[in-house]
Curated annotation (Swiss-Prot):
UniProt protein name: Endoribonuclease YbeY
Organism encoding this protein: Serratia proteamaculans (strain 568)
Cofactor names: Zn(2+)
A matching Pfam family: YbeY
EC nos: 3.1.-.-
Length: 157
């Protein structure tokens, strides 16, 4: 039986209306057990200022972003179930959901799925990597009961 441990940190000025811990747990459990038996992830929900600062510091981009992934790297010879941290910006997620005409809950779920796959080593820099990652995201989102998160982007009206 797999075990997923979540450390949820709420660092927004207004934490009302955010998905609850059980919902974040369900999303993680929809992703991680497919890849490893045990996993521990911190999800920190932040405002634009913190997202912007972290994005500038670690990616050189002076703007807030939807999700940042910080994989944990254990010292050689030490095995821990700690995968890493996801930093998710509330305002960016809410704005993107509205702009893309997506259900807010589904977009939150997508950010957790997307970020978790980054923690597991997936990326989307090269086209073939992006295709593999998007395919996994779509499959996982369907398993969680959500539509293809890329459908609207792939098939504009």
């Amino acid at each position: 039986m797999s075990q997923v441990i979540l450390d949820l940190q709420l660092a927004c000025a207004d934490n009302s209306g955010l998905p609850d811990e059980a919902t974040f747990q369900r999303w993680l459990e929809g992703v991680l057990p497919q890849f490893q038996e045990e996993a521990e992830v911190t999800i920190r929900l932040v405002d634009e200022a913190e997202s912007n600062e972290l994005n500038l510091t670690y990616r050189g981009m002076d703007k807030p972003t939807n999700v940042l992934s910080f994989p944990f790297e254990a010292p050689p010879g030490i095995e821990l179930p700690l995968l890493g941290d996801l930093i998710i910006c509330r305002q960016v997620v809410e704005r993107e959901a509205a702009e893309q005409d997506k259900a807010l809950e589904a977009h939150w779920a997508h950010m957790v799925v997307h970020g978790s796959l980054h923690l597991l080593g997936y990326d989307h820099i090269e086209d073939d990597e992006a295709e593999e990652m998007e395919s996994l995201e779509t499959e996982i989102m369907h398993g969680l009961g959500y539509p293809d998160p890329y459908l609207a982007e792939k098939d504009p009206l």
